[in-house]
Amino acid sequence: MLHYLQGLLSALDLTSLLDAVLRVAAIFLCLTVHETCHGLAALALGDPTAKSMHRLSLNPLRHIDWIGLLMMFVAGFGWAKPVPVDPRYFRKPKQGMALTALAGPVSNFVLAVLAMLISKVIYLDRKSVV
């Protein structure tokens, strides 16, 4: 048994383990920020629904749909719990829904740009970033 465990541990590459942990953390961060931004946009436009349901939180457990998360790892796509929005609170419901829907993807774009800038700083002394 001990020999088996030693073989298993030697086969583990700590770099790939760290890579997997960072990927999972990035997924949790992106899903959480994405859904929170939907709620913040709705709140800014007059809809308190997400706030009253405690969904304006950076706590990933409030936003993660466990089946959607599993699908993300198994199939390469997934989802989170959608933030509830009531368009009746918006002065212009169609425009409010469009802006609220746009807030999530915009947050993903901003996070991607930040990640790119951080990686440029980290790998500044290298010739290329992969």
For each predicted feature, which ranges?
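Hydrophobic transmembrane alpha-helices and their immediate loop junctions
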Residues: M1-V130
